[in-house]
Every structure is written in structure tokens, then in C-alpha cells.
Amino acid sequence: MPASQARSGLQAKAHSQDVALFIDWENLKISLSQAILRVNVSSLRETAETYGRLVIANAYADWQDDWHQSDPENLYAAGIEPVYVPTRVVTESTGIRRRKNSVDIKLTADCVECCHNHPNIGTFILASGDGDFIHMVNTLRPYGKLVVAVGVSWSTSPRLAARVDQFLYYDKDVDPVDTQRYRPRGAALNSGEDDALQHAFELVVEI
């Protein structure tokens, strides 16, 4: 069966169910910025609404970061709730200071909690290319949920794309761009396993 027909079939199946959209804002924004592109929140919401009635739409980031200063206003205008996740600076043994946040953990916890508390939601859409979310995907699917991921073609974890029921390329299926004109700069984002995320995932599932 052609991919377009398979996608239409999944959308038709999900259309009678409610939909939740969870956006890893920094992952999506950084990925697109590599090609000097911005996140089109309206297109993202419209894509989610093709799967049914969108009842939850959250975007996760450190909104106090200057880089995200104007983003919450655009998200609110599109009917998407900005969820604040603070960033902390960690000094490694080598003396290198790195910025870290807990978006993966917070988003995963909210998503799994939503699965338990809102059985009316049959479709979960994750806007991220981070392979660490495989744990979350593996939790939702046994509950009969349709799991869709949206990621940028040049920075998405192949492992994540392989685990979801349906994968959409943001730059091809959501907000198409001319990839010959907009070429990503630098290497793709890496997605390593996160022990803290796995631990949080296990705690939430036990609830």
C-alpha cells in the first residue's frame, strides 16, 4: 500500500478520537535554525487537527531564555500552551559548562499522565526528533494509542521514526521547504539515551 494511502487510513481511524499535541520546542527550533528556518506554529496545529479534535496542545521550553522571548505570544495566538521548564548550568569534570534542561522528563511525565487521566484521547502527536522519547512511545502504544511523531528530516533519530505508528517530516509534510535552497548548517543533533529520563519514565508508569 502506498505511504499516502496508509497515512490517510490512520488519519481516518483517528478522526473520531481526541488529539493531544506535545512539542519539544527547543529541539524543533534548533533543528530548523540549522537551515535558517522558523517554526510555523499554525501549520503544526493544523496538521494535528487533521487527526481529530485537538484538546491538548503544549510546548515545552525555558521561556525565560532570551532566545525564546517572542515565542510564547505566537504560541498563545495559535492556541498552544507554553509550559515552562527551567534550564540549569552544569559544570563537568573537564571544567566545561553546559546548559541542561528537563524538557524530556517533564514532557514525558505529562504525556503519560494524560494517557491515564484522559482515555478519550486516542492520538498523541510528539513534535520532536529526540530518540530519548522512545520510552514514552513504548508506553503509549500498549494502551491502544495512535502515536505520531513530527521531526525535521536532517536531525531526527531514525530509532524514534521507526517506533511510532506514523512519522511526519516537518519540512516535507507540515511546512514544506525547498531543501535545495535551505540546507542545514552543521551536524545533525545527537540523541543519546538519558538515564534520568528512563528513571522518571519508570516512576510515572508505576502511578
Question: Which ranges hold each PLM region?
Answer:
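Domain-level signal for Mg2+-assisted phosphodiester chemistry and nucleotide/NA-binding surfaces
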Residues: P2-D110, H116, R141, L146-V148
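Short, ordered loop/turn segments at secondary-structure junctions
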Residues: E26, T87-R88, G129, V152-S153, ...
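Long, low-complexity, charged/polar intrinsically disordered regions in eukaryotic proteins
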Residues: A149-G192
